[in-house]
From Swiss-Prot:
Database matches in SUPFAM superfamilies: ALDH-like
Presence of the UniProt keyword Flavoprotein in the record: no
Described purpose of this protein according to its UniProt entry: Catalyzes the NADPH-dependent reduction of L-glutamate 5-phosphate into L-glutamate 5-semialdehyde and phosphate. The product spontaneously undergoes cyclization to form 1-pyrroline-5-carboxylate.
Protein name: Gamma-glutamyl phosphate reductase
Location of this chain's protein in the cell: Cytoplasm
Length: 421
């Protein structure tokens, strides 16, 4: 770590810490007013945002990014309007700050009141998707937290203009003591430049990395600060021979094809050996644009498929490839899922309640779906307005991380002279 990199990180984190203290005094109305202005600025600056995004897209073409990665990077009119809608939904959510979690009077007369309070300073590291900066900054601001945002180099120009809109809205608000440092954007995209931030456990309260396996490992191995992991999504689906026929293909196509470059897109499909339409199903998936890879048992039923290797079943493709394996039972499917899963999203298509219960109770992931698309594993779809990400860990939060998960608690104890005996 160079002296310059260390001082750069310390300067940003120190300002964010100071800014977080001022945020605590804001009312819900004041916070929502700033978010409303950001919402308006997004729509007013659509042309400028798309222009900056085009620079990132052109750079992506030169770098040879996959079509799925380019889709993650794209900002068009529809997505900008969706970002504005997301802010509106966050504004309309109840403010968790100040919520009473517990109130009681102890036998000795002490009054205990536990309330939700902001975590403080949240650093989020993310890749590719520039809309993430709007979701995280909005959620952080509404929950009273300062945020430090570090996006990937591929979305640099998009991230820069989006963060500047927050700075403009905050500057126009004239709120006392609230500065643009409540939303800090790290312009240095070199991975090694992140390390100095990871040592500032006296200034940054939590780090939330969302991205590939390499990023998660890098942050976890180098950070002194608590890390909430938003790991890769190796999403698995078990297709039972007892599934309702008319829902199978629409769910599989939606789960895989709608947006293949996101973490809740399907990656592995396990089909019961007695499912009656395996050949037709795989053919229909190919017609829908899915690149089907099959293990040897699948190849014996549907010849000429490319081989799905053992490594493929551990892989978050983030494109149209799909690994397929034929299994003997729900237990066989579960054993495979337990082996390959990243703990993100699992799904079963079946009409057998006993089989469904076995599947639900036997797996351990952030979300388990029954007879619906895996694409619903999303903060917005879960009614959270938006999400910081989808946590694959088990501590503090698991699954979509929304407003309430950006808070902790403080207990206020009031007495009348009591001393402990």
């Amino acid at each position: 770590m160079t002296f310059e990199a260390t001082e750069y990180a310390k300067s940003i984190a120190t300002k964010a810490k100071e800014a977080s203290r001022a945020l605590k005094s804001l009312t819900t109305l004041q916070k929502n007013s700033v978010l409303k202005r950001v919402e308006t600025l997004l729509l007013e600056n659509e042309t400028a945002i798309i222009k900056e995004n085009q620079i990132d897209l052109q750079n992506g073409i030169q770098k040879g990014l996959s079509s799925a990665m380019m889709d993650r990077l794209l900002l068009d009119s529809k997505r900008i309007q969706s970002m504005a809608k997301s802010i509106e939904e966050i504004r309309n959510l109840p403010d968790p700050v100040g919520e009473v979690v517990r109130g009681t009077i102890l036998p000795n007369g002490l009054e205990l009141l536990t309330k939700r309070v902001p975590i403080g300073v949240v650093m989020t590291i993310f890749e590719s998707r520039p809309n993430v900066i709007v979701d995280i900054a909005s959620l952080s601001f509404k929950s009273g937290n300062a945020c430090i945002l570090r996006g990937g180099s591929e979305a640099y120009h998009s991230n820069l203009i989006l963060s500047s809109l927050f700075h403009q809205a905050i500057g126009e608000s004239n709120l006392p003591s609230v500065t643009k440092d409540v939303v800090s954007f790290v312009e240095n995209t070199d991975r090694e430049a992140m390390v100095p931030f990871f040592q500032l456990d006296d200034l940054i309260d939590v780090i939330v990395p969302r991205g590939g396996e390499a990023l998660i490992r890098f942050v976890s191995e180098n950070s002194k600060i608590p890390v909430i992991k938003h790991d890769k999504g190796v999403t698995n689906l078990y297709l039972s021979n007892k599934a309702k026929e008319d829902i199978v293909l629409p769910i599989l196509i939606n789960s895989k094809v709608q947006r293949p470059g996101v973490c809740n897109a399907l990656e592995n499909l396990f089909i019961h050996k007695d499912y009656p339409h395996i050949q037709t199903l795989l053919s229909d998936l190919q017609k829908a644009g899915v690149q089907v890879l099959g293990d040897q048992s699948t190849q014996s039923i549907f010849p000429n498929l490319p081989l799905a290797t053992e490594a493929d079943f551990y892989t978050e493709f983030l494109d149209t490839r799909l690994s397929v394996k034929i299994v003997k039972s729900v237990e066989d499917a579960m054993q495979n899922i337990q082996n390959y899963s990243s703990g993100h999203t699992e799904c079963i298509l079946s009409e057998d309640e006993s089989e469904i219960q076995t599947f639900r109770q036997g797996l351990d992931s952030a979300a388990i779906f029954v007879n619906c698309s895996t694409r619903f594993h999303d903060g917005g779809e879960f009614g959270l307005g938006a999400e910081v990400g989808i946590s694959t860990g088990k501590l503090h939060v698991r699954g979509p991380m929304g407003l309430i998960h950006l808070t902790t608690t403080t207990t206020y104890v009031t007495g009348k002279g009591q001393v402990r005996g």
